[in-house]
C-alpha cells in the first residue's frame, strides 16, 4: 500500500491515527506542524526526490510507533505500555523503527552518535533537553520540529521544538543512524 493512500485512509476514517493528538494534549502549534508534515508527505510521495521519499518513509515508521505509545502514562523507570519514561520510550521507538538497540538511560544514549544542532536535525535523531542542572530528558525527532515525547505530566505526546518550553531547554540532537 503506498504512503499517500495510507495517510488518506487514516484521516478519512475519522480516527486521528498516527498524526493525531489526543484531545487533552491538543495544541495549535502541534496541530499546525502535523498538518504541515502531512502536506510535506503528500508532496514527497507524489513528486519528491529519492531522499525525500526515504525521509517520508522514516517519518511514517516513527509516527506508527508513536501511535502505539500515544497516551501511555509517564512512570520514572517504566519500560512498558503500563508506564514509560523518556529514555525507555526512545529505546523502544528505536527498536521498533530502526531495529537498533540503544542503552536504557539517557546518559548512555547521548554517547551513541554524532551531535547535531537543531537546524540540522533529521527524522530519527535523538533530541536531548536540559530542564534541570544536567542534560537528562530525551525524545525522538520526527520532523518539522515535532518529536515523540514522554512527558512527565501528560504521558506520551507529540511535542514541538517551537514551543517556548522545549525551545528553552533544547541542548542538541544526536544522530545514531544514516537516513
What function would you assign to each model-found segment?
Residues 1-16, 142-179:
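Aromatic- and glycine-rich peptidoglycan recognition patches
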Residues 72-123:
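Catalytic cysteine-centered active-site loop
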Residues 60, 64-68, 88-96, 122, ...:
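Solvent-exposed, polar/charged alpha-helical surfaces in well-ordered, non-transmembrane soluble domains
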Residues 1-72, 176-179:
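Intrinsically disordered, low-complexity
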Residues 138-139:
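A conserved glycine-rich beta-strand in the N-terminal activation segment of trypsin-fold
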Residues 124-125, 145:
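Structural motif
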Amino acid at each position: 500500500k503506498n504512503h499517500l493512500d495510507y495517510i488518506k485512509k487514516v484521516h478519512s476514517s475519522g480516527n486521528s491515527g498516527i498524526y493525531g493528538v489526543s484531545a487533552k494534549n491538543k495544541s495549535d502549534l502541534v496541530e499546525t506542524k502535523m498538518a504541515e508534515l502531512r502536506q510535506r508527505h503528500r508532496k514527497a510521495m507524489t513528486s519528491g526526490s529519492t531522499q525525500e521519499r526515504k525521509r517520508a518513509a522514516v517519518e511514517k515508521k516513527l509516527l506508527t510507533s508513536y501511535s502505539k505509545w500515544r497516551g501511555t502514562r509517564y512512570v520514572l523507570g517504566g519500560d512498558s505500555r503500563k508506564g514509560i519514561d523518556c529514555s525507555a520510550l526512545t529505546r523502544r521507538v528505536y527498536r521498533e523503527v530502526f531495529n537498533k538497540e540503544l542503552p536504557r538511560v539517557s546518559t548512555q544514549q547521548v554517547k551513541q552518535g554524532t551531535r547535531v544542532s537543531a537546524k540540522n536535525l533529521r527524522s530519527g535523531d535523538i533530541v536531548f533537553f536540559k530542564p534541570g542542572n544536567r542534560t537528562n530528558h530525551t525524545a525522538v525527532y520526527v520532523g518539522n520540529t515535532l518529536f515523540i515525547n514522554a512527558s512527565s505530566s501528560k504521558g506520551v505526546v507529540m511535542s514541538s521544538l517551537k514551543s517556548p518550553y522545549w525551545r528553552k531547554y533544547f541542548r542538541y540532537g544526536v544522530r545514531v543512524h544514516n537516513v
